[in-house]
Design a protein with these regions (language model features):
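Bacterial N-terminal signal peptides that target proteins for export
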Residues: 1-8
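C-terminal region of N-terminal signal peptides and the immediate post-cleavage residues
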Residues: 16-37, 42
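Active-site rim/loop-helix segments in enzyme catalytic domains that contact anionic ligands
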Residues: 91-94, 101-270, 274, 306-307, ...
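Charged helix-capping and loop-helix junction motifs
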Residues: 296-304
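PAPS-dependent sulfotransferase catalytic core
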Residues: 326-353
Length: 388
């Protein structure tokens, strides 16, 4: 010990102060002819860049009693970004999930990162025009993904109202939930909620309680009909008109919220970024060969997804398209248990849709055109579509 004391004494003699810990930089002071260096300790930077004003806004104005100032200041940057977004969009109830994410929270790209449970086995993201399109043209791909343990996240662009009002569309939504109960092989209780995305649009969500594998998103835009011109009940507006630039926006048939073409595209991209799916499936684009005679809403839905892939916002290698009405011209390629499961799910759905005159697998198989579509599924990768 005397040796170390002597060393420190010598250092002190030469005007060097010895301090423990990390420090930056030194300040020199001359006293009595001796120069003494004083180390200035710099406090660590805060974990996020929220200003005092932003913190106060979150904790006292937007979401009082939900999160404390101390907790907000302790959030790492991705959590702080998410908390600020949820607070600014009046979605305070989801902030608890942000706090629970801890320091390993990923960069914030969408509230869906916290609204939804993670899917370790991967995700299939599908985009359709109408409520039965996934059951007809997306099957058996969707049931197969669920059997493999993957999650399925499905976005429906229209309210599937066929000009018959919200009640008809809501009934079809009930049919979807019943059909997915069959696919999941369990009667489930479903919860309904909404989420406001980073593009400002609010989506309706339906998902089974206790089973995170399925989530259905409803944009509820006007059904365009087979003539592509829409219906009087929804102002004679449609997706084809929007894509063609004939109108600037559509309005959700339930809330009246305005939605532009960019709004639809950014919704697709946000869901894609939130879920990072292994596969994206949609209708075959109208600008590709093989869609002549398909429903105009189908064609436009495919075109919107195709544009996101062409622009690189969605990985083209992950995108596949399902042929719609024209698939009936191809040979039947589904049979046995695979076909039976598809028919059983569709029949349950159809029992909620008064336009489709069937409620059993056998009777649905005999419905004009529907039977032909149900016994087939034809898929085309994005990299193989043929454009005229």
């Amino acid at each position: 010990m005397r040796r170390y004391a002597a060393v420190f004494g010598i250092l002190a003699l030469f005007g060097v102060s010895v301090l423990s810990g990390c420090s930056t930089p030194s300040e020199a002071e001359t006293t009595g002819g001796r120069t003494i260096s004083t180390v200035v300790l710099t406090p660590p930077p805060p974990p996020n860049d929220l200003t005092d004003e932003q913190v106060a806004q979150i904790t006292t104005v937007q979401c009082p009693d939900v999160i404390t100032e101390e907790t907000v200041r302790a959030l790492v940057q991705p959590q702080a970004d998410a908390a600020e977004f949820f607070a600014s969009t009046a979605q305070c109830g989801d902030i608890a999930a942000v706090v629970a994410a801890g320091e390993g929270a990923p960069a914030f790209v969408s509230p869906l990162q916290y609204v939804e449970a993670p899917c370790p086995a991967g995700t299939l993201f599908t985009i359709w025009a109408h409520y039965d399109d996934d059951l007809i043209f997306g099957s058996p791909t969707i049931p197969d993904a669920l059997d493999a343990g993957q999650c399925v996240r499905t976005l429906y662009l229209t309210g599937s109202d066929a000009g018959m009002g919200l009640g008809y569309g809501y009934g079809r939504e009930d049919g979807l939930r019943a059909a997915y109960d069959v696919i999941l092989n369990a009667p489930l209780e479903w919860e309904q909620r909404t989420v406001t995305l980073t593009n400002g649009l609010t989506l309706a969500i339906s998902r089974p309680i206790g089973d995170p594998r399925v989530t259905l998103f409803f944009l509820r835009l006007p059904d365009g009909g087979l003539g592509a011109g829409g219906f009087p009940a929804t102002g004679m507006t449609s997706l084809p008109q929007l894509l063609a630039g004939k109108i600037r926006e559509l309005h959700m048939i339930d809330t009246g919220e305005a939605v532009s073409l960019d709004g639809i595209s950014s919704t697709v991209v946000e869901l894609y970024n939130a879920y990072q799916p292994q596969t994206v499936m949609a209708h075959l684009p109208g600008s590709a060969q093989g869609t002549s005679g398909d429903h105009p809403d189908h064609q436009v839905t495919g075109d919107i997804v195709m544009r996101t892939a062409d622009s690189g916002q969605v990985d083209p290698a992950k995108v596949i398209y399902a042929q719609g009405y024209p698939s009936e011209a191809h040979p039947q390629n589904l049979e046995g248990d695979v076909l039976q499961r598809k028919l059983d799910a569709f029949a349950v759905y159809a029992s909620h849709d008064p336009v489709i005159p069937c409620s059993t697998a056998d009777t649905c198989l005999n419905v004009n055109r529907f039977g032909g579509w149900l016994v087939r599924q034809y898929l085309v990768p994005h990299t193989e579509i043929v454009r005229p």
